[in-house]
Amino acid sequence: MRQRTIVCPLIQNDGAYLLCKMADDRGVFPGQWALSGGGVEPGERIEEALRREIREELGEQLLLTEITPWTFSDDIRTKTYADGRKEEIYMIYLIFDCVSANREVKINEEFQDYAWVKPEDLVHYDLNVATRKTLRLKGLL
């Protein structure tokens, strides 16, 4: 079984948290709301990976003013690829508390939508298991 280390930013701006809705046809959690993030590449430092993933998935304009390592989690997930293939992967999630100076987001093709969500509204979103676990641990659910 392949192992992946995933960096996940829990991004907050003015009391709201950034959630991204995964594309319906790919990823570990198709069609569900999640934190952004992605895999650490060989030879890449963890914070470099976090900043790269944010640029790739959320655009160059989102400005982070704080990045603080917070916690980790792990599980086994089945990833569905755009061509229909599936693969089981052991996922290690490194989760960071982040604060952004703005809400300028430009999502890439991995996502179909995004939202800045106040804690009291999080229960109304179809959150994936990993995101739900993270938000509970943070005391937001």
From Swiss-Prot:
Check the record and name the Pfam families matching this protein. Answer: NUDIX
Q: Which UniProt keywords apply?
A: Hydrolase, Magnesium
Positions occupied by motif Nudix box: 38-59
What family, per the record? Belongs to the Nudix hydrolase family. NudI subfamily.
On subunit structure and binding partners, the annotation says:
Monomer.
Annotated Gene3D superfamilies: Nucleoside Triphosphate Pyrophosphohydrolase (3.90.79.10)
GO MF, one example? dCTP diphosphatase activity
The UniProt function text for this chain reads:
Catalyzes the hydrolysis of nucleoside triphosphates, with a preference for pyrimidine deoxynucleoside triphosphates (dUTP, dTTP and dCTP).
Listed cofactors: Mg(2+)
User: Is Cell division among the key words of this record?
Assistant: no
**Name listed for the protein in its UniProt record:** Nucleoside triphosphatase NudI
> What are its E.C. numbers?
3.6.1.9, 3.6.1.12, 3.6.1.-, 3.6.1.23
Q: Does the record bear Transcription in its keywords?
A: no
Taxonomy of the source species: Bacteria, Pseudomonadati, Pseudomonadota, Gammaproteobacteria, Enterobacterales
Q: Where is the Nudix hydrolase domain?
A: 1-141
**Native source organism of the sequence:** Escherichia coli O1:K1 / APEC
The reactions it catalyses are: a ribonucleoside 5'-triphosphate + H2O = a ribonucleoside 5'-phosphate + diphosphate + H(+); a 2'-deoxyribonucleoside 5'-triphosphate + H2O = a 2'-deoxyribonucleoside 5'-phosphate + diphosphate + H(+); dUTP + H2O = dUMP + diphosphate + H(+); dTTP + H2O = dTMP + diphosphate + H(+)
